[in-house]
Regions:
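Short, surface-exposed amphipathic charged segments that create phosphate/polyanion-binding patches used
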Residues: 40-44, 71-76, 304-308
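Segments that shape or occlude catalytic/ligand-binding pockets
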Residues: 35-69
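Generic hydrophobic, helix-prone segments enriched in Leu/Val/Ile
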Residues: 5, 41-47, 106-109
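A contiguous, low-structure linker/loop signature
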Residues: 66-118, 138-142
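Active-site loop segments of alpha/beta catalytic cores
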Residues: 1-36, 86, 110-353
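Secondary-structure transition motif
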Residues: 26, 51-58, 77-85
């Protein structure tokens, strides 16, 4: 089968638009900590699966390099003034100090400017980014932009603290509207910059669910968050830019809302939402980039992994398309299981973009 760059892009777009893709686009995401642990043995697996890793070249990964400060052991303060702490090199940390934990700090608080401040340090080089997008397009690749993970809902509790935000929402604290507007304005400015540069797809990530339920009721989601996503995603759709939304956690009750807001590709977790829940609430309505069960991968036998992937494909795929697969492998996943994941994905699908 032809897996050229042009064919991969055409197939990816066919999957998004339910126009009979030739194969299911599949990806395997390897965390920095996973590379640090397995090193050359992991690279051997990657090199033996060029269908899943079509652009990887031997030696192109520095096993010890951690570019994102959020993935380095220790602490740092982001552009919003949120203090992060990380106990595991190569995995993401968490916010431990919240600049707006007291409402009394809100009036004097000045949010960052995304045009001149990167969220995790540094100044964005927009000219370089513009040229990179042009180069990707000239190569027949997808020109992709995006906001940092956790840019709307999660940023609210990064600023207030999770418990405080839950109380704010439960009690309909009037000050919440000002906080939401501030974060939304930041995001709108960021999105408009990407749209000005010219992108084909915008990536958004916000973990809207807990393990087995929403953290807030669907009604509260529709009151406080849905209008934000509708505005953010609507800007993209007006420019014919695809909207990709990643969300960890259980989101079944709000999938229709997210589609209404303009999501083209939804990246939900299979364990939190179940295959059956996604068949009922998402199949045929939106392209599903299914996050395979990362909580299964560390402990399963290769045969259990095979059955898991095959079952998801059997129930969620259709000839029209609308399905992609992604497997994220943390450092607790045995090499044998990573090999199995890659092999089975090659059996059921082909490369992504």
């Amino acid at each position: 089968m032809d897996y050229s760059i042009q064919e991969r892009l055409e197939n990816y777009l066919r999957a998004i638009n339910f126009k009979n893709p030739r194969w299911i686009p599949c990806r395997v995401s390897l965390m920095p900590a996973t590379w640090r642990k397995y090193r050359g043995k992991l690279e051997d697996i990657v090199l033996s699966h060029p269908v899943i890793f079509p652009d990887y070249r031997e030696g192109s990964i520095d096993f010890d390099a951690i570019k994102d400060p959020g993935y380095r052991k220790g602490g740092f303060t982001d552009s919003w003034g949120c203090v992060w702490e990380n106990i595991e090199e190569g995995l993401d940390g968490m916010v431990v100090k919240f600049p707006l934990d007291d409402w009394g700090k809100l009036d004097s608080y000045i949010p960052p400017d995304p045009i001149v401040q990167e969220e995790r340090g540094g100044t964005p080089d927009w000219d370089k980014i513009r040229e990179s997008l042009k180069e990707r397009r000239s190569q027949g690749k997808l020109a992709t932009g995006g906001l940092p993970h956790g840019s709307m809902y999660m940023r609210l509790f990064y600023l207030r603290g999770f418990e405080n935000l839950m109380i704010d929402i439960a009690t309909d604290d009037p000050r919440l509207e000002k906080l939401i507007s501030m974060v939304l304005d930041y995001n709108i400015k960021f999105i408009n910059k990407w749209l000005e540069l010219g992108v084909d797809l915008m990536y958004f990530g916000d973990d809207l669910g807990n393990q087995d339920r929403l953290p807030i009721s669907p009604e509260k989601f529709r009151k406080y968050l849905k209008p934000c996503y509708k505005k953010m995603f609507g800007l993209c759709r007006e420019k014919n830019v695809y909207v990709y939304l990643h969300s960890d956690g259980h989101i079944i009750e709000i999938i229709d809302d997210l589609i209404e807001c303009g999501v083209n590709i939804l990246n939900p977790q299979v364990r939190a939402n179940t295959v059956e829940g996604l068949v009922k609430n998402a199949k045929g309505k939106v392209c599903i980039d299914l996050d395979l069960d990362r909580q299964l991968f560390p402990f399963a036998t290769p045969e259990e992994i095979r059955r898991h992937i095959k079952d998801a494909v059997e129930k969620l795929n259709s000839p029209e398309g609308g399905l992609m697969l992604i497997a994220e492998c943390e450092p607790d996943v045995p090499l044998e299981n990573i090999e199995t994941i890659c092999s089975v994905l090659e059996e059921v699908g082909g490369p992504s973009v």
